[in-house]
Curated annotation (Swiss-Prot):
One of its GO terms (molecular function) is oxidoreductase activity. The active site is at 181 (proton acceptor). It comes from Bacillus subtilis (strain 168). NADP(+) binds at residues 37-44. It comes from the Bacteria. Transmembrane segments: none annotated. PANTHER family: DEHYDROGENASE/REDUCTASE SDR FAMILY MEMBER 7B, DEHYDROGENASE_REDUCTASE SDR FAMILY MEMBER 7B. This is Uncharacterized oxidoreductase YxnA. Belongs to the short-chain dehydrogenases/reductases (SDR) family.
Amino acid sequence: MTIDHSVTNTEQLEQQNPAIKTKLKLKKLKDQVIVITGASSGIGLVTARMAAEKGAKVVAAARNEEALKELTDELKEKGHDAIWVKADVGKEEDVNRIAETAISTFGRFDTWVNNAAVSTFGHAMDVTVEDMKRMFDTNFWGPVYGTRAAVKHYTGRGVPGALINVGSLFGDRGTVIQSTYASAKFALHGWTESIRMELEKEQAPVSVTLIHPGRIDTPYNEHAHSYLDKQPAHYRSMIYPPEAVAEAILFAAEHPKRDMYIGSQAKAIAMLGALFPRLTDRLMEKIMYHSQHAERPSNPREESALYDAGCGMHDRGTNKGWMRSRSYYTKATKRPIVSAAVVAGLVAWAAAKRCR
């Protein structure tokens, strides 16, 4: 066999399988089947509705069967294609069943969104190891199982697909009171970066995106397992709508993106933590204790969504802060030149603060 040495390894791979490109080309949403975990409330619920409005076929997964039925009925009444799968993402067999149901119904899926998550509020030494392990089942192992199912499907078909993991600003920077949540998100961020590099090295047809939300107005705090006397809440802080996260997720479903930050707050904290770690420690020690709870008594721990499904079909929480209607930073990141200018501005601001 004659080898054309003028052709690179990447080009040879592309010739063998035209679907594999150095820059993957993802389908338009109107031509996609999208799997969304944690779809019964908050970010997942808003993303499912928005994806359906853009023409995607939706596979909604969560533990709350009643909410899933209500959601899919709502979408079908509007003329959209949607199915639901009751699943606990902390169980690998349930995650595999989500993939199998999507494939048996629609023949494939094109985007997989690992969104399901829950939090525990309390001082690190107060939270039981049992509760910590349960949170990792949902927040870390769930995305791992989802990643494996998605990558297996995309590589098996040889057609590009998107894997989108929803992280957190606390996956870039630890915080007080939510130590276990931050640890699970740190693990998810490390997993996402590692699997991305391996897949890129293998020229696998998978776009891997990590979403970094700031504080979002969802029932996240109402679902939390709380050891605090006062109710967890986004309090006295900048709060973004779940639509801003959904827009970022769906943008990444069509356009390969490495990272997307929701809110300049999320990006600024990540940068400050990397550039000035001790200063950031001090700032967060001073601010975060008081900005993560409201003044009312905490909900009973048994009402949390850590072990059982939380209330469904609610996209907003009961947070009190500076509500933003959108994230201008997220919109800017869709345009690389504008994004670079914003980042440069943040760096200059951080440097100026240091010099004072």
